[in-house]
Amino acid sequence: MRVKGGTVTRARRKKWLKLAKGYFGHKSIGYKVAKQAVVKSWTYAFRDRKQIKREFRKLWIARINAATRAEGLSYSKFINGLKRANVTINRKMLSELAISEPKTFAMLIKIARDAK
């Protein structure tokens, strides 16, 4: 007896269309285009999980740089001074301090300047 794969095929296509729900135009309706769109979205998601880490680090460095230049010191000299003074605060915390607690950040700048 011949077995047709209708139920299996329908289930497989339904799975891909469910993943493409909310996509614009034919990407949410057509099976082939929907599958391609979902696979592409997974590619972007994988790439951007790595990129977001770089983007945030760039943001923190820009914030620290702006705060240190306001005090008359460059970012690189500030970070070098902190390393010489054995101050181990990561860039995320430094940027938060620069925004929320400028007095504490000014003390860190003084420590970095005095480090030899």
From Swiss-Prot:
It holds the Pfam family Ribosomal_L20. GO terms for cellular component: ribonucleoprotein complex; ribosome. It comes from Mycoplasmopsis fermentans. The keyword Nucleus does not apply. Belongs to the bacterial ribosomal protein bL20 family. Keywords: Ribonucleoprotein, Ribosomal protein, RNA-binding, rRNA-binding. HAMAP family: Ribosomal_bL20. It comes from the Bacteria. GO terms for biological process: ribosomal large subunit assembly; translation. GO terms for molecular function: rRNA binding; structural constituent of ribosome. Binds directly to 23S ribosomal RNA and is necessary for the in vitro assembly process of the 50S ribosomal subunit. It is not involved in the protein synthesizing functions of that subunit. This is Large ribosomal subunit protein bL20.
